[in-house]
Amino acid sequence: MSSIRLTQYSHGAGCGCKISPKVLDTILKSQIPGFDDPTLVVGNSSKDDAAVVDIGNGQGIVSTTDFFMPIVDDPFTFGRIAATNAISDIYAMGGKPIVAIAILGWPINTLAPEVAQQVIDGGRQVCHEAGISLAGGHSIDAPEPIFGLAVTGIVPLDAIKQNDTAKVGDTLYLTKPLGIGILTTAQKKGKLKPEHEQLAPNAMCTLNKIGQRFAELPGVHAMTDVTGFGLAGHLLEMCEGSGVSARLDFKALPLLDEVDYYLSEGCVPGGTLRNFDSYGDKLDAMDDRTRNILCDPQTSGGLLVAVGKESEAELLAIAAQAGLTLSPIGQLQARTGNQFIEVVQ
């Protein structure tokens, strides 16, 4: 374990560094028309996890990029988390990753190049786990450490899973526990107990490979990964894009151990309140604990899956084969009123 504390060199952490949804909407507004590409199957309009381009013969190329500042202190683990998070977007689209290139920003006068080497080695290890090469990349001298990947994948066009194609009656499942932002904030504040240090990294370093299997099921109508906008933010994107609303069973949500303890210690990421400020008016009324969990920015979070009854049993069987025990966290229903997410306690 390195003695370097990477989180002390950055103002943000992981996907909590994301620009808030409200501000991002402003940034992405443009008066300049985009190129009308008939081969672009999935682009920017649906706020999806990756772009997909039709390359013929029923196949699509999936393209994505993701990078952020350190969310843990250990350089090797940071590299693993950043790579796992970037590759996840390919799995969330139902695709298979085929190659990655690295994105590195490094304060060369502050942190030794050997530390950056550990970060890249962590990313390389995860690429190996995913069965792809880390084939190159680009680096710059930056005021804070930044690492991530640009990842390319392939997907059969009839197996693409988007975030705006959910249907009324679909059941919602989440493949990883929530609370990553809370525990990593505890670490940044120096409040994380030694016995809890691996709770969040273990989740963040788990590849969402199962998304490729879920994509084979015709009843999986929509899929996305839960990252910086929190469960509420990414579910809201699914609901708005699909023209539905969600009834969320709060007590059924999977949580990392000790989440409530660290909430009581004031370990709430700044991104939580930015998230709530961006979309809180579209949520059911809720108490602080509910808000702090639903809006908690996840880094390398789980897959949020909307599945119809015709494929639900098969989805659970695939999950069980992968060692996952999934329980439903909610249901999609017809949209009524201005609130997209109803939270049942």
Curated annotation (Swiss-Prot):
Q: Which reaction does it catalyse?
A: hydrogenselenide + ATP + H2O = selenophosphate + AMP + phosphate + 2 H(+)
Keyword Kinase among record annotations = yes
**Active-site positions, per UniProt?**
C15
**Cellular component, GO, one term:** cytoplasm
> Which SUPFAM superfamilies would you find in this protein's record?
PurM C-terminal domain-like (SSF56042), PurM N-terminal domain-like (SSF55326)
What does the UniProt keyword field contain? ATP-binding, Kinase, Magnesium, Metal-binding, Nucleotide-binding, Selenium, Transferase
Q: InterPro entries from the entry?
A: PurM-like_C_dom (IPR010918), PurM-like_C_sf (IPR036676), PurM-like_N (IPR016188), PurM-like_N_sf (IPR036921), SelD_I (IPR023061), SPS/SelD (IPR004536)
* Binding-site residues for Mg(2+), renumbered to this chain: D49, D89, D225
Please name the Gene3D superfamilies in this protein's record.
PurM-like C-terminal domain (3.90.650.10), PurM-like, N-terminal domain (3.30.1330.10)
Any keyword GTP-binding? no
For this entry, list what GO says about its biological process: selenocysteine biosynthetic process
Q: Which CDD domains match?
A: SelD (cd02195)
Q: Offer an example of a GO molecular function term for this protein.
A: ATP binding
Q: How is the cofactor bound?
A: Binds 1 Mg(2+) ion per monomer.
Its cofactor is: Mg(2+)
Superkingdom, taxonomy of origin = Bacteria
Q: Which family does it belong to?
A: Belongs to the selenophosphate synthase 1 family. Class I subfamily.
Say what the protein does.
Answer: Synthesizes selenophosphate from selenide and ATP.
Instruction: Quote the subunit structure annotation.
Output: Homodimer.
User: What NCBIfam families does the database record attribute to this sequence?
Assistant: PRK00943.1 (NF002098), selD (TIGR00476)
What name is this protein filed under? Selenide, water dikinase
